[in-house]
Regions:
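Short, charged alpha-helical interaction segments and adjacent helix-coil junctions
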Residues: 2-3, 80-85, 185-293
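Conserved single-residue anchors adjacent to enzymatic active/cofactor-binding motifs
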Residues: 1-223
Length: 293
């Protein structure tokens, strides 16, 4: 039977945002971010029907994601964004920083939701944290696989806190391909599971449960079909993009040959000489001459 990694879009969402996955989500955030919340709930809960609607909407728009975005809200109103990015692309750090800033400003002015009676919209702002899972080297292969970035005082390295003694912003990155990580630490177990789909005997019970939940053989038939359809669509889309790139390269090479041929013709070379140098046939060269007249 075909196997799929837990980083597959549907499986990653199910693992962290299904109604019975709250304890897995909470442990995942604690192990990677280093903060233990009393409660943590996803903004959008995973259900196969809502996921199908989400996928069909993106499919109609021609969007084929290589990343998974999850937003979770804690009991204190803080927001944690979780992204699983399987492919490297330009400006990744800028993008995740933008998402973090958006998560921070999301509660601005929402005094009712924050329970804050102060007549000041800034008092409604809550901390924002970002967790980014990457299947590539972002900071270099010899850097630590798990990296956290905080707002710190330049001299004392003390974190910048809000009034309620909460850190303002934290960005966390876990590379699945970087080997510089403490063996058998909670983060190591997550890295091993997400990268291979397997768990060791010493893995925490919640990671073992995450494996059972995301095992393809344990999925409902509807979920299995959805995953296979999505992966097939991605493969077709990827092949089309690859073909378009090759076609563009070929077209570019032909245009370069034509430009070179015209230069040779203008300085008095014969059609036969230009054909031998550029590889263009005589008829094509004559056509180029006529177009220049």
């Amino acid at each position: 039977m075909q196997t799929y990694l837990p980083t597959t879009d549907l499986l990653f969402r199910k693992m962290l945002t299904a109604p019975d996955s709250l304890h897995i989500l909470k442990a995942f955030v604690k192990d990677l971010l280093g903060i233990e919340f009393q409660s943590l709930k996803p903004r959008e809960t995973y259900h196969i029907e809502t996921y199908k609607h989400f996928y069909e909407k993106n499919k109609r728009a021609g969007v084929f994601h290589t990343e998974v975005d999850i937003l979770a809200v804690a009991e204190d109103g803080s927001h944690t964004t979780i992204e699983c990015q399987v492919r490297s692309h330009p400006h990744f750090i800028e993008r995740v920083t933008y998402y973090l800033a958006e998560a921070f400003r999301a509660s601005y002015g929402n005094l009712t939701a924050s329970g804050d009676k102060k007549d000041n919209h800034y008092s409604s702002l809550r901390p924002a944290y970002g967790i980014n899972i990457m299947d590539f080297h972002l900071f270099g292969e010899n850097q630590k696989a798990l990296k956290r970035f905080h707002l710190l005082d330049e001299e004392t390295h003390a974190p910048l806190y809000l009034e309620k003694n909460k850190e303002l912003l934290i960005l966390c990155f876990l590379s699945l391909v970087n080997k510089n990580i403490e063996a058998h630490s909670p983060a190591w177990h997550w890295q091993y599971f997400l990268a291979t789909g397997e768990v060791t005997d010493s893995a925490p019970d919640y990671i073992k449960e995450a494996k059972v939940k995301t095992d393809f053989a344990n999925l409902k038939r509807e979920e299995q079909k959805m995953i296979m359809d999505i992966e097939k669509a991605k493969a077709i889309h990827g092949a089309e993009l690859s073909g378009a790139r090759l076609e563009g390269l070929q077209k570019g090479r032909e245009e370069a040959k034509c430009e070179l041929a015209l230069k040779f013709l203008k300085i008095g070379n014969t059609l036969e000489q230009v054909s031998e140098v550029t590889g263009l046939d005589i008829e094509t060269l004559r056509k180029l001459e006529r177009e220049q007249e």
